[in-house]
């Protein structure tokens, strides 16, 4: 046995006694070994020997269930707990449980919000998308204008397709504008400056900046 392992074995009874008193719950020798081996370097044989020694000295209690022994702290060393103390502990448990549930719910909300933010477009991507949509809208507006001015050259089917496309792109416009607004609002919750200053810093230009109105549905 190495010197460090021998030193650990010599101190095993004290370490295990403190552990059982602090935890105040039953453990098997395997449980104690698994819980203390990494931190204190105790071997399985040293743990079993220390538990048997502590039980023989009356410092801990042991119970045998079939082929397994269970060890736990002597309950006589602990102060008697009154009914009032127990009720107080129960109330504390209820309050802490409610707090934990509230925090878990908050965590779920924040995780959902984070997922939404991380899946959203970045500012450069939004700017590029906006420019592309503006270009497409201008093209379709010009096309629609020409179609309206020359209805004799447009079949009802073509006209209907153009109007359907217009509704489709207007709907997409509204959707992306709403997504952009929600994303900016989420960012602004933790942004120290005003919304106007934020837009100026990242280079966001709104429809209103260019007097662009979203067409009616």
UniProtKB/Swiss-Prot annotation:
Highly expressed in testis and more specifically in spermatocytes. Detected in spleen, ovary and thymus. Its main location: nucleus. Residues 84-152 form a coiled coil. Phosphorylated by PKA, PKC and MAPK. Disruption phenotype: Infertility. Males exhibit testicular hypoplasia with lack of spermatozoa. Spermatocytes arrest at the stage of pachytene-like chromosome condensation and spermatogenesis is blocked at prophase of meiosis I. Axial elements are fully developed, but synapsis is limited. While meiotic double-stranded breaks are formed and processed, they fail to be repaired. GO terms for cellular component: nucleoplasm. Residues 118-182 are annotated as: DNA-binding. Keywords: Coiled coil, DNA recombination, DNA-binding, Meiosis, Nucleus. GO terms for molecular function: DNA binding; transcription coactivator activity. It is found in: Nucleus. It holds the Pfam family TBPIP. GO terms for biological process: homologous chromosome pairing at meiosis; reciprocal meiotic recombination. Interacts with the DNA-binding domain of the nuclear receptors NR3C1/GR, ESR2/ER-beta, THRB and RXRA. Forms a stable heterodimer with MND1. Interacts with PSMC3/TBP1. Plays an important role in meiotic recombination. Stimulates DMC1-mediated strand exchange required for pairing homologous chromosomes during meiosis. The complex PSMC3IP/MND1 binds DNA, stimulates the recombinase activity of DMC1 as well as DMC1 D-loop formation from double-strand DNA. This complex stabilizes presynaptic RAD51 and DMC1 filaments formed on single strand DNA to capture double-strand DNA. This complex stimulates both synaptic and presynaptic critical steps in RAD51 and DMC1-promoted homologous pairing. PANTHER family: HOMOLOGOUS-PAIRING PROTEIN 2 HOMOLOG, TBP-1 INTERACTING PROTEIN. Belongs to the HOP2 family. This is Homologous-pairing protein 2 homolog. It comes from Mus musculus. The lineage of its organism: Eukaryota, Metazoa, Chordata, Craniata, Vertebrata.
């Amino acid at each position: 046995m190495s010197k460090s392992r021998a030193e650990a074995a010599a101190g095993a009874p004290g370490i295990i006694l403190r552990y059982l008193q602090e935890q105040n719950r039953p453990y098997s020798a395997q449980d104690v070994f698994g819980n203390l081996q990494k931190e204190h370097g105790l071997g399985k044989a040293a743990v079993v020997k220390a538990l048997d020694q502590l039980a023989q000295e009356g410092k801990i209690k042991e119970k045998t269930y079939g082929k397994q022994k269970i060890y736990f702290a002597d309950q006589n060393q602990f102060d008697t707990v009154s009914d009032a103390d127990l009720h107080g502990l129960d109330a504390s448990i209820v309050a802490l449980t409610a707090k934990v549930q509230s925090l878990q719910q908050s965590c779920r909300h924040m995780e959902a919000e984070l997922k939404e933010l991380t899946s959203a477009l970045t500012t450069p991507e939004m700017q590029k998308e906006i420019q592309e949509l503006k270009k497409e809208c201008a093209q379709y507006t010009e096309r629609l204008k020409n179609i309206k001015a020359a209805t004799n050259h447009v079949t009802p089917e073509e006209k209907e397709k153009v109007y359907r496309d217009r509704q489709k792109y207007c709907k997409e416009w509204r959707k992306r504008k709403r997504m952009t607004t929600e994303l900016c609002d989420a960012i602004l919750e933790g942004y120290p400056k005003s919304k106007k200053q934020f837009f100026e810093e990242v280079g966001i230009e709104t429809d209103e900046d260019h007097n662009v109105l979203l067409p009616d549905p």
